Amino acid sequence: MSKSEQMLAALQEQDLALADRYFEQALTTDSEEELLDLADYLESIGFFPQAKRIFEKLAPDYPASYISLAAIASDDGDLEQAFAYLEEIQPGSDWYVAALLAKADLYQLEGLPDVAREKLAQAAELTDEPLVIFGLAEIDLELGDFSQAIKEYAQLDNRSIFEQTGVSTYQRIGVCYASL
């Protein structure tokens, strides 16, 4: 049984002191894959300091960790640090589009929809993911660029988007036309 598994067992027993000892041991003895799984789980249950330590340790080799670190920093209200983590993901990385989307979310949180739109537009140039186009349409609707929003909503499969987001693109197109 790995130290990560022992830590999780200690958490189930609500023995936090023992869980902490196993956590410290896991950092030095468990495989990177085990640590990534542990970090993801710890993040999901709100053990952010421990998840952060693992992600920081593994981030140079696992760029997706920077996205998790940015989410933790954002949840802590440290948007500057969240942006710094996302800047670590370079344009050639498989995770670059995800970093752009995370940046767009952060800019939206900061009340900067124009900058958020720029990041989404950059992501849309790199992927044909429908949710990226949907995000662009939503921001264009918010910014009052109804003609552009209509074009973007029209590219999407209403059923698929509705299943993923609960939003009807048909309804959004209607709102845009009514606002022209």
Give short role names for the model-derived ranges.
Residues D37, S68-A71, A102, G135, ...:
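Canonical tetratricopeptide repeat
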Residues M1, E33, A64-I67, A98, ...:
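Start-of-helix register in tetratricopeptide repeats
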Residues Q12, S44-I45, D75-D76, L109-E110, ...:
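Register position in tetratricopeptide repeats
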Residues T29, L58-D61, P91-G92, E125-L126, ...:
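Structural marker of alpha-solenoid helical repeat scaffolds
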